Amino acid sequence: MAIRRRRRTFHRRKVCRFCVDSELKIDYKDSKTLRYFVTERGKIVPRRISGNCAKHQRELTLAVKRARQIALLPHTTIHNV
């Protein structure tokens, strides 16, 4: 019986873009930047996928919620009835 060996794939660790570039700021009024961190279904992308650090993920979550509150970002996608 042949033994199958799995090759380990190397996954590059994602780096927080807000820590790397101090010019970038998280602002609830900047919906263009916030859309990158929201799925097409309207959910906030988790840290392990987006690569943000804990501090900036908390700020980002707060900014997305504020943008939703004043209708800069939708809560969900458009539903076809």
UniProtKB/Swiss-Prot annotation:
PROSITE patterns: RIBOSOMAL_S18
The keyword RNA-binding is annotated on this UniProt entry: yes
Keyword RNA-binding found: yes
Pfam families membership: Ribosomal_S18
Any one annotated GO CC term: cytosolic small ribosomal subunit
Keyword tags: Ribonucleoprotein, Ribosomal protein, RNA-binding, rRNA-binding
Annotated InterPro entries: Ribosomal_bS18, Ribosomal_bS18_CS, Ribosomal_bS18_sf
Domain of life: Bacteria
GO molecular function annotations of the record: small ribosomal subunit rRNA binding; structural constituent of ribosome
GO biological process: translation
Disulfide bonds: none
Oligomeric and partner information: Part of the 30S ribosomal subunit. Forms a tight heterodimer with protein bS6.
Alphabetized NCBIfam families for the sequence: S18
Function: Binds as a heterodimer with protein bS6 to the central domain of the 16S rRNA, where it helps stabilize the platform of the 30S subunit.
Protein family (similarity comment): Belongs to the bacterial ribosomal protein bS18 family.
Name the UniProt record assigns to this protein: Small ribosomal subunit protein bS18
Encoding gene, per UniProt annotation: rpsR
